[in-house]
A protein has these predicted regions:
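Rhodanese-like catalytic fold shared by cysteine-dependent sulfurtransferases
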Residues: 1-21, 28-63, 68-114
Length: 114
C-alpha cells in the first residue's frame, strides 16, 4: 500500500529536524520539458529504479514526486518501500506543490529552482 503526504505536511517536514530527502521521479521527457524542481530535490529516472534504489540510505525518510502524484510516483514509492525504505509520494505531484506554494508567504522563490 502506497503512503502519501500532502504539500502542506511536506512543507512542515522540510523545516523539521529530520527532513526527508526529495526525489523527483518525473519521466525523463517531462523533466526535460520543465526542469524546475522542488529545492534540494534530486532527479532520478523512474524507469531505471533498479539502478539507483539500492544506493539510498535505509531507514531515511524520502518523498518522491512526479507531475501530478499519479502512477509514476506511486509505483516508485511502492518499489522503494519493498526495499525497506521509508518512502512517501507527494499528493498532486509538483503541480500541487507549485500551486500551493504560490500563495505561501515568501516561499515561491525558494520552492522551485532550475
Amino acid at each position: 500500500m502506497t503512503k502519501s503526504i500532502n504539500p502542506q505536511e511536506l512543507r512542515k517536514r522540510l523545516t523539521g529536524v529530520e527532513a526527508p530527502s526529495l526525489i523527483d521521479v518525473r519521466r525523463k521527457t517531462d523533466y526535460e520539458a520543465d526542469p524546475k524542481k522542488i529545492a534540494d530535490a534530486i532527479w532520478r529516472d523512474p524507469e531505471k529504479i533498479e539502478d539507483w534504489v539500492k544506493d539510498l540510505p535505509p531507514g531515511a525518510p524520502a518523498v518522491v514526486y512526479c507531475v501530478k502524484g499519479g502512477s509514476v510516483s506511486q509505483s516508485v514509492a511502492d518499489r522503494m518501500r519493498k526495499e525497506g525504505l521509508d518512502a512517501l509520494f507527494l499528493e498532486g505531484g509538483i503541480k500541487a506543490w507549485t500551486e500551493n506554494s504560490q500563495s505561501a508567504e515568501g516561499l515561491s522563490s525558494e520552492v522551485l529552482k532550475k
